[in-house]
Amino acid sequence: MDRKILMLVALVAAASATAQETYENARIATEDLNGTARYVGMGGALDALGADLSTIGTNPAGIGLFRHSQAKISFGFVSQQDARDFDNANKTNMSFDQVGFVYSMRNGRKSFVNFAFNYHKSTNFNQILSAANVLSGASQNKLSYLKGAGGLFSVGPNDKGDLVGDNNMFNSVDYLYYNAFLTTHDEDGVPSYGYNDATAYAFNRASSGYIGEYDFNISGNIDDRLYLGLTVGIHDVNYNGYSEYSENLVSSEGTPVGSVAIGDERIISGTGFNIKFGMIFRPIENSPFRIGISASTPTWYDLSTRSHTVLANNTDLGEYDSGTSDEAYDFKLYTPWKFGLSLGTTFGNYLAVGASYDYANYGKLDTRINDGGGYDWYY
């Protein structure tokens, strides 16, 4: 068989949301427990207790409980000593978690108006992830095959002679599989398609980067009973990940035929913003018991991604030993609304008790590819 090297360059991808991995979307949309030492030590259950800079991003009214101006800075470490060695990733990383200040102004005998700024690392992407297991009746190349056989797209040659799909459900991994592995041509050039099941897989991912959140807050209280706050947050996304996925393949008779591996390097960057509202009130005048309510708009992200994907065909099947794909596109990611309810009280000067409940329907996570053109395909 004539073995070749296959190359794909995707300049602007009018692709479906499947081009952006669900894992990475979920990591961008969710947050780590991070902030001041007090906030982390309380498990984040300070939304009703307030008077902590980290509540600026969860219940903005918490800043309204400050009576004096102050500044804080926090550091931390992320350690995965039990992780396997992969891609020269560090197992221990220092983390600059938080820095901020609050400026408090008295506005009457019992009322204050406060202004605050806080930076915190809402998500730390420094992580090594590994997984391996057996497979039965499944494989990644089979998934690409079934997408075409099931009618999600039709495959045919473009003017360069390489196989492409006819709609946005056809992504770069499908392209690599159809051109390098799934397709064979007879002597007359007529293509036929087939897949191979896998008996085992191995997956490794190393990622780095962060989402930095810059929060600007105005808050205050009325008669030391009702506390109100508003925060505008700006998010800065920096993600770099590299993953490798390999499968051991067998023929239809169960005979080993070799392996196929996919390596993917992806960079995501961009910004987002949201607005948060909060209220805390003391229903009993002489009691420290407090109830907190908060709401956050979606975080509206404008992001760009660039990826380089490599397929290594370590079998005698298909028509190419390897293939590469480079793509770049812009997309929007909108997180769902988030609502919070919290309770808190203190016992003297020695004990604080807090409880927080947050609700967000991540089934409403919205990803939209900026459709500015189409794929350009090259050998």
What residue ranges belong to the model's regions?
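Outer-membrane beta-barrel translocator/receptor signature
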Residues: 37, 49-58, 63-136, 209-212
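N-terminal targeting signals for Sec/Tat export/insertion, comprising classic cleavable signal peptides
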Residues: 30-48
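Single-residue recognition of alpha-helix boundary sites
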Residues: 14-15, 70, 235, 360
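Active-site-proximal flexible loops/turns
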Residues: 9, 66, 240
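Outer-membrane beta-barrel porins/channels
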Residues: 20-33, 104-379
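A broadly conserved detector of short glycine/acidic/proline-rich loop/turn motifs that flank catalytic sites
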Residues: 11, 46, 77, 105, ...
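Bacterial Sec-dependent N-terminal signal peptides
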Residues: 1-23
